[in-house]
Design a protein with these regions (language model features):
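Active-site ligand-binding patch in enzyme domains
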Residues: 2-26, 30-37, 41-159
Length: 159
């Protein structure tokens, strides 16, 4: 999931959607999913990286360059160890946010260690309970009765 504010709209190629005009206080949310024609998010062998091919990967990087914040669940970090940076197009790396209610993010994850962009882990566990590099910001959130975090907090993120 990516959030976008009007102040970070970069020069775009024609296939990148154009952001509607909005005030500086509003956000746009873009969801990006990689899946095959048969609806799978991984190949038969379990490979989940680059499933959409080179064009899809370039499009993903363009969306990241366009966004202020990119948000992923801890499952994506555990399975894919993503960098969540802009590499295939010109642009600035967005803030990276990991939703991790149970504190499962691996301390050796690339996005926690490369310092390429501001990184935030949202967890129900206290920062002192997580073994994360000092430059990573931990935001401790309460869980609801079903053990879930409210995603409304994402709307308050600023890069």
């Amino acid at each position: 999931m990516h959030t976008l504010s009007n102040n970070r709209v970069h020069e775009r190629e024609s296939w990148v959607p154009k952001a509607p005009k909005s005030s500086s206080t509003s956000s746009i949310v873009i969801a990006q999913i990689g899946q095959s024609l048969d609806g799978q998010v991984a190949t038969a062998s379990g490979q989940s990286k680059y499933i959409n091919g080179a064009g899809g990967l370039r499009h993903l990087h363009a969306l990241r360059a366009w966004a202020d914040v990119v948000v992923v669940g801890v499952g994506s970090v555990v399975a894919d160890d993503p960098k969540l940076t802009v590499r295939l197009v010109d642009g600035t790396n967005p803030m990276r946010v990991v939703l991790d209610p149970k504190g499962r993010v691996p301390s050796q994850s690339q996005l926690l260690n490369d310092q390429a962009a501001k990184t935030v882990v949202m967890s129900a566990r206290q920062a002192t309970d997580l073994l994360l590099p000092a430059h990573v910001t931990v935001v401790t959130l309460a869980l609801d009765d079903n053990g879930k975090m409210s995603l409304l907090v994402i709307s308050f993120l600023k890069s």
